[in-house]
Amino acid sequence: MAEDTDGGIRFNSLCFINDHVGFQGSIKTSPSDFIVIEIDEQGQLVSKATDGSLYEISKIQSEPSNSVKKPKLNIQNVSLEHKNSEGAADLPGCSDGDRSHQSDSEKENSVNSVTSKCEEESVDLLRSLLDEKTHTSLGQFACDIKRMWNSQTELTEPSPELSLGKILDKNRRAVLHSAVRQAFPFLITVGNQGEVVVKPNRECKELCRLVSEEEALGFFKYLDAKKENSKFTFKPDPNKDHRKAVHHFLNKKFGNLVETKSFPGQHHSAGNPDSAITVRFREKARGKRSHPEGCERGKAVYTAFTLQKENLETFEAIGLLAVKLGVIPSDFSYAGLKDKRAITYQSMVVKKVTPERLKSIKEEIEKKRMNVFNIRSVGDCLRLGQLKGNHFEIIIRHLRNQLNDSANLTERILEAIENVKNKGFVNYYGPQRFGKGQKIQTDQIGLALLKNEMVKAIKLFLTPEDVDDPVNKAKQYFLRTEDAKGTLSLMPEFRVRERALLESLHRFGVTEEGCVRAWFSFPHSMRIFYIHAYSSRIWNEAASYRLAAYGPKVVEGDLICSDEDADKHFPSSKVHLVTKEEESAHTYALHQVVLPVLGYNVQYPENQVGRWYQEALSRDGLQACRFRVPALKLNVPGCYRHIVKHPRNVSHRLVHPDPATEEARVEGPHSDDTASSLSLSFDLDASCYATVCLREMMKGDI
């Protein structure tokens, strides 16, 4: 298949399987000309109002459980010999929820009262768990480690260690591990066949080089406590470079557990630019440690709703909703992406938001061309592909014949509709999958990610278009300077994705590691979207090659799936390799042929098409690619996609202008050639594109 010089697909190089002439017209003249309504797994349109009685929200529904048994720990000023408590009130601490509205005295009192209580609990626990000799040895070991650190003596290898003996009872062992780390946060404990061993916490020493000892000890107490919904805040710091170093350390060492963010200090001003770093547990990290296996979903709050949006990308809509609801984009789940230049209806589920909270923002989001309805509580999130398909209502305007075609226009239109109904269309991924009209297309970003070229992928994402507007000026500035902070000041507030990425780059730097961190500012569904875009481009090219090489005939080595109702994620066990005998007997038809969408768990055709796949991967430098990007936690198993699909429930109306009134009137199939628009309605399976179906019908680019 031919490609543009910038690597994007020339959509007009794709094939047709029908021999009609087609016609010309304009689609998406306005969003109301292109309506997309998701069809759920039960075959119902999601735009249809649900029976409210079926989704009555329980008034006694509980919030997510916070029943973690460990006490809240705000200990900040525990010296290793447990002597000096002076100045503890001046140290920042961790707390449940948001305490930003407390006065300084309230904060100090709450911190100190809990500190005293927790110190007593830890000391009492250790004395009750250890015999006197072991307890004394532990105290001496802790003092020795502290003296070595204070004298700047480097620890020898292997690290010094102390055995606290074998503890046969599992629960008793767990309590001992926690009690030691709470009393001595500069120590760590490890288990070895029931034996509890104590070692120096080298990461605590590293953190002490960046922050005060009190802050470092407090942070490790916070980390061990794993108190749900808690936060830990370091002292305000006016030095931006120093704060960045602390961010880097915490995210490098504990990024899988916690996330960090700087907030202006209480006395922040232009002359006093101090900000404080606040740490909180990541949602997944809290979930793994706070709930028994498989119990989190039952206790979390999930709210399902239908999202109506107009002239907005799905990701853009999610970003706006996340801001209004105070959650992050990855808290939203959906069955599929929908067109931007359209009015679309789709199911969504948001986590950690009650139905009442979602209802409260309805008026605000209407200003952003969005609406939410069918709001109800559910028990789990949505998965990609969890839909039956989509229903389309489309108006094609300015109808006319193809160039040099003088035939009756109405007959051309009716012929085209009947052909596609009966013979189908090539099931290409649509141009919107790749960023139609954009200089850099999504598949190019996906290729860079598959090759682990993280900095390149970021720069591709931030490549400007040839348009003189604030967004593209900001992107130009970034590519010229790599100044993430300066670019943030230029990037408009409504560009949620770009700003999230730039905030991460400002925090972590424009390095390979920093760019990996920046990609995590996007939810998993968006990160993997770019990989899927590359796989989609290869599939489109493979489909064109297959049709050019063999035409409509099913040949030996083709892959077929006889179940036309199977979704695109059916396993390889459902795929059959066509034999020579089956080719000769014409056992199968073209609509049963599937091609693999790239991944680590797919089978390739055993004919010229299979060889083409390998050559395409080698061309792009992916001959050894395993379709896993561990740095971004992306795994792409692959799937299969039918070459040909058919629209269902097709209906149409021709609309003509009335010569007397200039108003449009609807006519039957025998109208004359003054038709000005065509109203089409049809259903497509999940992951099929209406623009591709129209392309086959009209025989031209859309």
UniProtKB/Swiss-Prot annotation:
Gene3D superfamilies: TruD, catalytic domain (3.30.2350.20). GO terms for biological process: mRNA processing; mRNA pseudouridine synthesis. Residues 96-109 have a biased composition (Basic and acidic residues). Keywords: Isomerase, mRNA processing, Phosphoprotein. The keyword Glycoprotein does not apply. The modification Phosphoserine is found at S79. Residues 84-116 are annotated as: Disordered. Its EC number is 5.4.99.-. It comes from the Eukaryota. Residues 424-646 form the TRUD domain. One of its GO terms (molecular function) is pseudouridine synthase activity. PROSITE patterns: TRUD (PS50984). The keyword Metal-binding does not apply. InterPro entries: PsdUridine_synth_cat_dom_sf, PsdUridine_synth_TruD, PsdUridine_synth_TruD_insert, PUS7L_N, R3H_PUS7L, TruD_catalytic. The active site is at D339. It catalyses: a uridine in mRNA = a pseudouridine in mRNA. Pseudouridine synthase that catalyzes pseudouridylation of mRNAs. Belongs to the pseudouridine synthase TruD family. PANTHER family: PSEUDOURIDYLATE SYNTHASE PUS7L, TRNA PSEUDOURIDINE SYNTHASE D. This is Pseudouridylate synthase PUS7L. It comes from Mus musculus. The lineage of its organism: Eukaryota, Metazoa, Chordata, Craniata, Vertebrata. The gene is Pus7l.
